[in-house]
Amino acid sequence: LSDRAFAGSDTWATSYTIAQAIRKIGGVDLILFGKQASDGDTAQVGPGVATHLDTPQITYVRKLVAIDASTITAQRMLEEGNETIRASLPCVITVVKEINEPRLPSLKGKMNSKKAQITVWKASDIGADPQKCGLNGSPTKVIRIFTPAARSDGEILVGEPEETTAKLVDKLMPIIVGASN
């Protein structure tokens, strides 16, 4: 997918664009995404595509347990542990890095990749509404990108509990009182 119409896309417009391409392909049963992109780090595109396609989704997948003609069963990571979920196909899944150990391509694979024909679709090729792509279709707008000011090192209070508690209260009260005004 490459078109100036896609420029400035947020995750919602990106999800719409990818969903339109999947519709064009047709007959897709399983749509696989990484958990998140390294640029925005939002983990929203996979679930957004599922929303646009009105398909089930399983996020944070660490292991595929079973798949048949109509369902997929996957184990997903949660903060508290793992959860096994079954969903009907077609389905969107987002995977975490623990799902697989990537392997390096063979020399033959590298050579063959140089000959590969890459199909490029523009917005018109996938039937995308220009008002839903790129900056036009993005409900969020980047106003400013900046590097936050460096934070000072923390302070360690040393002494007896009563003494350090009093010091801590003295330091926090102006912040607390100032925040409530």
List the predicted regions and their residue ranges.
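N-terminal glycine-rich FAD/FM-binding segment characteristic of electron-transfer flavoproteins
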Residues: 1-181
